[in-house]
């Protein structure tokens, strides 16, 4: 069973996409009475229209997630116009700690995937408060960041984004750093296809993509995160050993300990199987460090009970 914690925009977009991909045992949990039940019923009716067999239910009780093999955490407040991910920290950290206790009590064997922002810090809280192995506490971010970079590259070059391999590291926020040197199109290094100015434009568009969506429509991205969550579920369920970037707890990788950072990793049926350490230049190491320090700063502002 796949449990989605939170029946808001991201949670419901995820549920719809999972249904359309054939995942037929879904549970929505949210605190608002009637909200997850109504959403589940609406989605069940849609499935009937489409001829899709699905078992989906809604609940206000966290006990109902017993037996879940994957828990997708989408609960929390979304980013409002003008609000940074960092400003979400205090508002969502307590929610993560509370959900961690619920997951630990009722779904102790589940793989937990977090999309609540600021996701790097929220993943740190979830890891610390569940006490789960780090392989089973995964912050979703990098798939979306890299996909955004691939989209902007494809738009500038007039090619399919399926041919683009884009890499973003560090964190999900303003200190994320796209890595043009390690990105390519059809196997050709990006630096051979685009000018320095064009690459700088792609980097800027990628970093500011989330804020642009929020500014344009008044609330943060939901379809993008949902699509990435679905890819993550598929990689776990199919044991496909895909390499995706995630926000993960580091234990010596890239020279860091006791912090979460966005790095590429192999994912399969047990969660994260290994973190891939890319060869970085001195300038790239500096940018990676800036991202890590930004996450550390966020974590250090949390009360001790949320980070220990």
UniProtKB/Swiss-Prot annotation:
InterPro entries the UniProt entry points to: L-lactate/malate_DH, Lactate/malate_DH_C, Lactate/malate_DH_N, Lactate_DH/Glyco_Ohase_4_C, Malate_DH_type3, NAD(P)-bd_dom_sf
Residues where NADP(+) binds: 6-11, 92, 115-117
EC supergroup of this enzyme: oxidoreductase
Catalyzed chemical reaction(s): (S)-malate + NADP(+) = oxaloacetate + NADPH + H(+); (S)-malate + NAD(+) = oxaloacetate + NADH + H(+)
Enzyme Commission no: 1.1.1.299
Gene3D superfamilies linked: Lactate dehydrogenase/glycoside hydrolase, family 4, C-terminal, NAD(P)-binding Rossmann-like Domain
Species for this entry: Aeropyrum pernix (strain ATCC 700893 / DSM 11879 / JCM 9820 / NBRC 100138 / K1)
Pfam families, per database record: Ldh_1_C, Ldh_1_N
Functional description taken from the UniProt entry: Catalyzes the reversible oxidation of malate to oxaloacetate. Can also oxidize tartrate. Can utilize both NAD and NADP. Catalytic efficiency for malate oxidation is 3-fold higher with NADP.
Single Gene Ontology BP annotation: tricarboxylic acid cycle
Source organism superkingdom: Archaea
Assembly and binders: Homotetramer.
Temperature dependence: Optimum temperature is 95 degrees Celsius.
Keyword Oxidoreductase: yes
Name of the featured protein: Malate dehydrogenase
pH effects: Optimum pH is 11 for malate oxidation.
Similarity remark: Belongs to the LDH/MDH superfamily.
Keywords of the record: NAD, NADP, Oxidoreductase, Tricarboxylic acid cycle
A Gene Ontology molecular function term of the record: L-lactate dehydrogenase activity
Additional free-text comment from the UniProt record: Ala at position 30 is responsible for coenzyme specificity. Asp or Glu is present at this position in most NAD-specific enzymes. The next residue, Arg, is important for NADP binding.
Binding site for substrate: 79, 85, 117, 148
Catalytic site positions: 172
